[in-house]
Amino acid sequence: MEIVPISSVELPIVSALSRKIWPISYKDIISEEQIDYMLNKMYALEALQDNVQKGHRFALIHTGGEAMGFCSFEVHFPDPGISKLHKLYVLPNQHHQGMGSALLSYAVQEAKKDQCHTIFLQVNKKNPAIAFYQKKGFTIKEEAVFDIGQGFVMDDFIMHMSW
């Protein structure tokens, strides 16, 4: 298992992985229409490139030379000392093999290197990953509903972890 930071050149891999992961991971949480809308809005190559231009850092996790998942995070966002974990996904057939934990540890270590003391994330209130994040030390700080257009919303918990 190897985690590799990537540049814009490898973003098509992230886009392709998201299209394999999302329909399975979110099928019992949001509608198929919302999954398609969010993939097209947030994981199109142009959207991912825009993320990089805004300061998001992406990394892939590989095993056997093949990409199995990814994360993205931003340091000193929205304030100095705070980091936001924007994305953390692993192929469903690779769950429970330590890859999500490794990606999360990578993002936290990178945040620490940049003098951050807190990392936060948004997660759908119905997402079973909440238990994973709680096990890793995150706590629910607030709830928020975000209008993402076309009549869709993200109904999320905001979770934080500090060190």
What does each model-found stretch correspond to?
Residues 70, 94, 132-133, 138:
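Conserved hydrophobic/aromatic "anchor" residues
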Residues 5-11, 15-93, 104-106, 110, ...:
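Acetyl-CoA-dependent GNAT
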Residues 97, 114-117:
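Short coil/turn segments at alpha/beta junctions that flank glycine-rich nucleotide-binding fingerprints
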Residues 1-3:
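Extreme N-terminal starter segment of soluble prokaryotic enzymes
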Residues 120-124, 134, 139-157:
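Conserved catalytic-core motifs of GNAT/GCN5-like acyltransferases
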Residues 91-93, 97, 125:
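Active-site acidic-Proline motif in GNAT/NAT acetyltransferases
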Residues 101:
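Residues forming the Rossmann-fold NAD(P)(H) cofactor-binding site
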